[in-house]
Structures are given as C-alpha cells and as structure tokens.
C-alpha cells in the first residue's frame, strides 16, 4: 500500500512539474513574442524623451549660468533702470527727503498710478499678512489703490477680511474691498472683475499678490522703473522666498524644485527669449499689455500662463528680476501639495492643447519663438517631463526585470538621470544632501503629474477642477496672541491613506523581489527604495498633519 502511495506521489509531482514547465514555456513564448516588443518600444520611446529632456535642462542651465554668472547680464544692465524722479529732482525710494517725495510729496504726480490686487478665498490664516504688506508699500498714497478681491464662501471669514480693510481705510490707505455674487472663473474671474471697476481705469500698472505673499515695502520702487523706462516690457516677475521651508522634509524638497525653477527656467527664459510663464503672483503687469492680450481668461486652471503666452504673441517682453524676493508660504500638507501640482500640470497641458494651433498660425512672431513655445516651453517641460519620469523610472525599468529579452541602455538609465541631478545640484549647492530624497519624492509625484498631464491633453471632465492650495500659516501661528484657527480636530486615519501610491508600491515590491530572487539585472536596490518612498507617502508620512483619531 505504501509503495502504491509513493508511486502516486511521484506521478503527481511529475505531472505538476510537467504542468509548471508547460506554463513557464508558454509564458516564455508570450513574453518573447508579445510583451518584450511592446516593452522594448516603450524603452526606446523613453530614451527619446530622455534625450529631449536632458538637452533642454542642459540648455537652460548653460544659459542661466553663462548669462548671469559669467556675462553678468543682470536686469539693470540689459534694461534701463532709474529711480523715479520728481519734477523738483526728488528721487522715489531714497531716504529722508527723497522718501518723503515717494510717499506723497508735492511731486507725487511723477509716479504712475498703480493697482495692487490681492485675490483670496477663505484665507483666514494669512489674510492679514498680505493686506498689511500691501498697505505698507512705499508709494504716494494718492497714486496707489489696494484692491482686495474676496471670493470667500465663509461669512465669518468675509467679515474678518472686510473689517481688516476698513481698519486700513481709517489709516487713510486707499483700499477697496470687492466681492462677487459667484466664483465664476475662480482666480481669473476675480482678477478680471477687479479690473472692470471704474477706478482702475486710471491705473497704468497692476501688481498681483496671492494671499500668503508679503512684499517688502520697496517692492514697487524696485520693479516699476523697469516698466516706466522700457515701454516694450509688459511684465516684471520677481522671485518667491519661502518662510516655512524648514517645517518638514517635504517643504525643503519643494524649495529645491522651486529654487531651480526660478534660477534656471525663469532666468534662462528672461535672458534668451524675454519670455517665461508668469507665476501668478509677485509680479507687476503693464495694464495695456493685459488688455492687448485679451485680458484674463478662465478656460484653464493656469490663467497666469495663459495670459503670459497671449501677451508674448502680441510682442510684449517679460523680465525676471531674481534679486527682488517676496515672502510666501509653501503647502506643508501632502494633500494640499498634490492638489497644487495637479492644477499646475493639468492646466499647462490643457493650455498646450488649446493654444498649439494658435501659436503655429501666428504671423506676428518668428519661427524661432514659435519653436521655443511649442517644443521647449510646452511639449518638453509640460508634457514629456511628467510622463517620462513616472513611465520610465516607475513602470518600464521595474517591469524589465521580468522580461530578460528587453535591454535598457546604460546611458539612458544611468548617465542621463545622473546628468540632470548634477545640473540641479549645481544650482542648489546647499541642498545636495537632500538629493536622494528629492529624486524618490519627485518620482512619486510624477505619478500625479503624469495623470494630470494626460487629463489636460485629453481634456477629460475634471480638466478645470480648481482646488485652492491650503494655507496653514506655519510661520505665524506661534506668534499670534489669539490663534487664527480653532484647534484642529484629529484626522481620520483613513483620510491619510492614498490607495494609488500603495498600489504602485505593491507593484514595485513584486518587481524588486522577483529581481532579487530570480532576476539577473540587479535593479532591486533602486526599486526597493522607490517602493518604500511610495509606501511612506501612501500612508501619509509626508508633510505636516494632525494625529490620527
């Protein structure tokens, strides 16, 4: 009996082994004939996009370094800049008597009329900061109008903002509190409505600050002269400075990315093309440039970039001044940052879809400028970059460990990303120690950016979804005598779990484990690290948050 049972076990084992061999053989055939060709095509597509991206990054880095560091092509050398001088010889922006001239002397008429717009939406944490900073700007009081555009839906917050405006009005500040019956067009709608008031028709320039931005008192004295003395300049953009960058690791990484954006992208665009995307705040527009471009439009969630592209097609030049910095707040919660990045990426891709034909057919600009707009500004930076990062580093490379027939060139997998990282590190020398975290975090965020870019390109139903970036007021909440916020309630643990991140993490863990046990490509160390990054963010271990209930 035992001998018969032994023969049955051997037969079953042989059958199982035979079945396993058949399955393995079948998978090998399918893999070689169907999976491998598709994956190899994806590899070469990613290689092509990688070359596009590294050349673009190298070009921008070289231009920004040579133009600013070596040739010293600073704004004051490229364009005429002189302090605004009154008829009697007084100079706006100086000390003593000169400062008196700038703040309302007899020669105030020498100063152009300036409108300062502050759009806000339920900004209970930071509204006092922006309003106070705007009201403290050094400029003749009869030559400036502060316009608070309050789209708040919370009646209590609206009352607080209106009360703050009345307090400044009692101090003889020319401040207007404006509200709308609806939020049509969101920020673009508010800015457009603000420009429709009769009193704005006397204004030559308009400075725009989001609710968490705090310009220095001499902001207008430094920026307006560029516009006054250079009639072809339609926009002066200044640099953002972050007051809460040290709150957590996520804000430090954000600072790295945005510092690179300003030092490289904006600087190179300003130096070589007199064009870049308006950042939506901390900038001064010539009103005639806005009007000639067709005003604010709400067709996308990047109304600032939309206006900039249209104004550029009309021949207006833009100037970025990196020496002028405006304090602002970074989103310190992962949820807020995800929403912000989705809005920026989706809106830019959607604007590309809407304006590509218009740019190509425009007869008022050169072929070189059309190429720069369509290829560099939109296609490579707003489409290729987000799609490539996630597709190649989080999908194709991990999957390739299971398909030995697929080969990935070392130059595309190692040399190009290393070159991009080095170029980023050169412009962020103080943050080199954060580079590994920056790489892993950006790869996770690339999942959301790719989805947002595809949403914008395909124009799905959520393409114009607008979620205002949450302001926490990290840098002021400990200094307030009376807290601006009620005590935060504990967060439901479920709300801190992000399923998409965890699904990608599971996929990466499977690929890494396969490579460790059965594979021969030895990518598992990188894949494991990237999987742990997805796990950390998937469970909400990024940014600031309240304890779980």
UniProtKB/Swiss-Prot annotation:
Catalytic activity of the protein: GDP-mannose + (glucomannan)n = GDP + (glucomannan)n+1
InterPro entries the record matches: Glyco_trans_2-like, Nucleotide-diphossugar_trans
UniProtKB keywords: Cell wall biogenesis/degradation, Glycosyltransferase, Golgi apparatus, Membrane, Transferase, Transmembrane, Transmembrane helix
An annotated GO cellular component: Golgi apparatus
Listed GO MF terms: glucomannan 4-beta-mannosyltransferase activity; mannan synthase activity
Binding site for substrate: 210, 212
Entry superkingdom: Eukaryota
GO biological process: cell wall organization
Membrane topology (UniProt): Multi-pass membrane protein
Coiled-coil region list: none
Cited Pfam families: Glyco_trans_2_3
Transmembrane helix among keywords: yes
Protein location: Golgi apparatus membrane
EC code(s) of this entry: 2.4.1.32
Transmembrane segments: 35-55, 383-403, 406-426, 497-517, 523-543
Keyword Transmembrane helix tagged: yes
Family as reported in the entry's similarity comment: Belongs to the glycosyltransferase 2 family. Plant cellulose synthase-like A subfamily.
Function text: Probable mannan synthase which consists of a 4-beta-mannosyltransferase activity on mannan using GDP-mannose. The beta-1,4-mannan product is the backbone for galactomannan synthesis by galactomannan galactosyltransferase. Galactomannan is a noncellulosic polysaccharides of plant cell wall.
PANTHER family named among the record's database cross-references: GLUCOMANNAN 4-BETA-MANNOSYLTRANSFERASE 4-RELATED (PTHR32044:SF43), GLUCOMANNAN 4-BETA-MANNOSYLTRANSFERASE 9 (PTHR32044)
Name listed for the protein in its UniProt record: Probable glucomannan 4-beta-mannosyltransferase 4
Species in which this protein is naturally found: Oryza sativa subsp. japonica
Gene designation: CSLA4
